[in-house]
Amino acid sequence: MIKEEIKVYENSQALSEGFTGFLQKLLDVYPHVNLSLSGGTTPKALFDYWSANCRDTIDWSRISFFWGDERCVPPEDVMNNFGMTKEHLFDNIPEIPANNIHRIHGENEPEEEAQWYSRVLNIDVPLRNGIPSFEIMMLGLGDDGHT
């Protein structure tokens, strides 16, 4: 098990390098990593970093992508977190298997989608004490302090 740590980085480049190093450590320990994503400018910078620097250095087949939040808009909307991830990561790294991408369908009726995604998480993510447990959960922090 990887030791839990809180790290603070000076800029998005340093964060991208540090996050990538942590991901590589997890891939050294676990056969498969479940990664929960968020939207925002920091993840976008990380996805751009991965697209430019990590296409051939990360075993993308061993990572499953989920989302911790999504807006109730279709993926073509600029506010959609999956759409941003697709544009800045998935479209640039075709080695990421489509069946490893588990998006929230923001275009669907919210309550039904929340119930559907809950089932997805309970089936596709290992449970710890009955709760889906991710190896990495990326949380955004807005200017107003929201997560």
Identify what each model region corresponds to.
Residues M1-K3, D59-M138:
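Ligand-binding beta-strand-loop-alpha-helix segment within the catalytic cores
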Residues M1-L35, E111:
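N-terminal glycine-/serine-/threonine-rich phosphate-binding loop
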Residues N34-S38, S64-W67:
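Short, conserved beta-strand segments within well-ordered enzyme catalytic domains
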Residues L37-T42, L139-D143:
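Glycine-rich beta-strand-to-loop/alpha-helix junction loops that act as flexible
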Residues G40-K44, R71-C72:
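Short active-site-proximal "capping" loops at secondary-structure junctions
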Residues W50-R55, I93:
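Active-site catalytic pocket residues across diverse enzymes, especially alpha/beta-hydrolases
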Residues P132-E135, D143-T147:
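Anionic-ligand binding region
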